[in-house]
């Protein structure tokens, strides 16, 4: 019986060596790098998780905020009086896909994420200080870009987040707050 076990282990070891022989590996790292960046949804998810800091429970508006390009870039504030729709007061026109929701869940690494369809109702129902975030579509150019994340308190507070592909995942850093 032990010979059979030894034979199975030997086959598994040889199969493992053969499967990694052609992988693109760095001499100092064991994980292969991915030549092309991850999906835009992963970039947006990284920005949301970054903006949430370490809050254990976060509400995320279920869909992208539709805002003018200048607002998404952080060049001007959301002008509610001037006719911009308040992404913290009305539902998005299109909900996230299941793969976008999965990317967001993965980026939050086990923290509780509640997807909210009606942000105005959610703000009324959630306890004071609860975090509710909404994001615009990422503005990406290759391996870098930005995502405007809005924290609803109840009015939108803009935070422009820079995202960069590091060969394995999108990494997020604050670029600063958008104009208010």
PLM regions: where:
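Short beta-strand edge/turn micro-motifs at domain boundaries
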Residues: 158-180
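Sec-dependent bacterial lipoprotein signal peptides
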Residues: 1-15
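Flexible low-complexity loop/turn motifs enriched in small/helix-breaking residues
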Residues: 17-157, 177-180
């Amino acid at each position: 019986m032990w010979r059979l076990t030894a034979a199975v282990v030997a086959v598994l070891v040889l199969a493992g060596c053969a499967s990694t022989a052609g992988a693109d590996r760095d001499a100092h790292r064991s994980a292969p790098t991915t030549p092309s960046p991850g999906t835009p949804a992963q970039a947006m998810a990284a920005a949301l998780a970054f903006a949430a800091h370490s809050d254990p429970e976060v509400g995320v508006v279920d869909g992208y905020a539709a805002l003018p390009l200048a607002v998404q870039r952080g060049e001007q504030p959301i002008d509610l009086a001037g006719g911009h729709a308040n992404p913290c007061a009305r539902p998005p026109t299109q909900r996230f896909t299941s793969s976008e929701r999965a990317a967001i869940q993965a980026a939050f690494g086990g923290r509780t994420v509640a997807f909210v369809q009606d942000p105005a109702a959610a703000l009324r129902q959630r306890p004071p200080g609860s975090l509710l975030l909404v994001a615009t579509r990422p503005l990406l150019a290759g391996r870098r870009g930005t995502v405007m994340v809005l924290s609803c308190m109840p009015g939108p507070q803009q935070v422009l987040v820079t995202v960069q592909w590091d060969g394995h995942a999108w990494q997020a850093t604050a670029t600063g707050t958008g104009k208010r």
